[in-house]
Amino acid sequence: MSRIGNKPVEIPSGVTVTVNGADVTVKGPKGELKRTFNPEIVVKVEDNTVVVERPSDKKEHRALHGTTRSLISNMVEGVSKGFEKSLELVGVGYRAQKSGQKLVLNVGYSHPVEIVPEKGIEIEVPSNTKVTVKGIDKERVGAVASNIRSVRLPEPYKGKGIRYEGEYVRRKEGKTGK
């Protein structure tokens, strides 16, 4: 990870990065993100870039170096562009619809499944078989999308279920009768 850690993070116009000890705050047109990093890793703002430095070449410092740089890069990208994850529902009668802020999924259970998005996460339903999760925090967008997918995981025999857009579902042969 040390090669990634050595790359500086470019700060686009309209985005400000503030470092206060181990706390890094990133403000942009879409919102504000704050995160506390390991105090051993040094984060500096120089000109229009964020530079991450490690104290030594120990294995744990090398790993934290790259991780910290990637997390800061995702924070900068999130407040400037935002993140989006798309899911598709595959199966006869599988539908998604929005009811206020809640997402209501009809995916073959005896009852509709309701999902309430957490603060800062927006769920859109462009069609009744597509769901889009949007937000500025990459980690939370992925977690909400994963929770929606876990309601009905894609099964290998008919491919029914909720899957990420473009996800390949490995199919299996059914049993052959005698």
Swiss-Prot record:
One of its GO terms (cellular component) is cytosolic large ribosomal subunit. SUPFAM superfamilies: Ribosomal protein L6 (SSF56053). GO terms for biological process: cytoplasmic translation. GO terms for molecular function: rRNA binding; structural constituent of ribosome. Keywords: Ribonucleoprotein, Ribosomal protein, RNA-binding, rRNA-binding. The keyword rRNA-binding applies. InterPro entries: Ribosomal_uL6-like, Ribosomal_uL6-like_a/b-dom_sf, Ribosomal_uL6_a/b-dom, Ribosomal_uL6_bac-type, Ribosomal_uL6_CS. Belongs to the universal ribosomal protein uL6 family. This protein binds to the 23S rRNA, and is important in its secondary structure. It is located near the subunit interface in the base of the L7/L12 stalk, and near the tRNA binding site of the peptidyltransferase center. Part of the 50S ribosomal subunit. This is Large ribosomal subunit protein uL6.
